[in-house]
Amino acid sequence: MDLPGPIHDFLLVFLGSGLLVGGLGVVLLPNPIFSAFSLGFVLVCISLLYILSNSHFVAAAQLLIYVGAINVLIIFAVMFMNDSEYSTDFNLWTVGNGITSLVCTTILCLLMSTILDTSWYGVIWTTRLNQILEQDLISNSQQIGIHLSTDFFLPFELISIILLVALIGAISVARQ
């Protein structure tokens, strides 16, 4: 979208905070239905971020595939589970939560140090090269393929990892 700078920054901060709140809702809410709805909110916020970065096709695919199909399937599977397992008393912190938060914090610190220590010169050069190549391409599907493999590679892979973790969690909760 071609928005003025302050409006673009406000929407970026608003959607980023929506992602954080939704992600915390997925992890911290005791009811799996509410966690699934929170996951849907996170996926919609990611789709809106794609729209904000002028990638309308990826945003539409995100909405149709992840929100429209996968998240609805997760909600449908969770609704068939026995609800008596989830009591009303909510234990906020257990040993497993502490170990999980320690592992996640360690992974986050390693990821941040890797991002800060990496020389991004080659990535910028590759992007510029693909922008030069992009003018010679005829079809939009070739341009989408180049953008998915260069500019939007990291967000595309991150959402697939988030989806994989969510599906593994839904399967493990359904088996119990």
Curated annotation (Swiss-Prot):
* Pfam families reported in the protein's UniProt record: Oxidored_q3
Record has Secreted as a keyword:
no
> What InterPro entries does its record include?
NAD(P)H-Q_Oxidoreduct_6 (IPR050290), NADH_UbQ/plastoQ_OxRdtase_su6 (IPR001457), Nuo/plastoQ_OxRdtase_6_NuoJ (IPR042106)
Which reactions is this enzyme annotated as catalysing? a plastoquinone + NADH + (n+1) H(+)(in) = a plastoquinol + NAD(+) + n H(+)(out); a plastoquinone + NADPH + (n+1) H(+)(in) = a plastoquinol + NADP(+) + n H(+)(out)
Q: Where are the transmembrane segments?
A: 10-30, 32-52, 61-81, 92-112, 152-172
Keyword Cytoplasm on this protein?
no
Location (main, coarse): plastid
Where does the record locate the signal sequence feature? none
Q: Which GO terms describe its molecular function?
A: NADH dehydrogenase (ubiquinone) activity; quinone binding
Membrane topology term reads:
Multi-pass membrane protein
Enzyme Commission identifier(s)? 7.1.1.-
Where is this gene product found?
Plastid, Chloroplast thylakoid membrane
Q: Which UniProt keywords apply?
A: Chloroplast, Membrane, NAD, NADP, Plastid, Plastoquinone, Quinone, Thylakoid, Translocase, Transmembrane, Transmembrane helix, Transport
Record's Gene Ontology CC terms?
Answer: chloroplast thylakoid membrane
Q: What does this protein do?
A: NDH shuttles electrons from NAD(P)H:plastoquinone, via FMN and iron-sulfur (Fe-S) centers, to quinones in the photosynthetic chain and possibly in a chloroplast respiratory chain. The immediate electron acceptor for the enzyme in this species is believed to be plastoquinone. Couples the redox reaction to proton translocation, and thus conserves the redox energy in a proton gradient.
- Give the family, as the similarity comment puts it: Belongs to the complex I subunit 6 family.
Q: How does it assemble?
A: NDH is composed of at least 16 different subunits, 5 of which are encoded in the nucleus.
Descriptive protein name: NAD(P)H-quinone oxidoreductase subunit 6, chloroplastic
Q: Which organism is it from?
A: Crucihimalaya wallichii
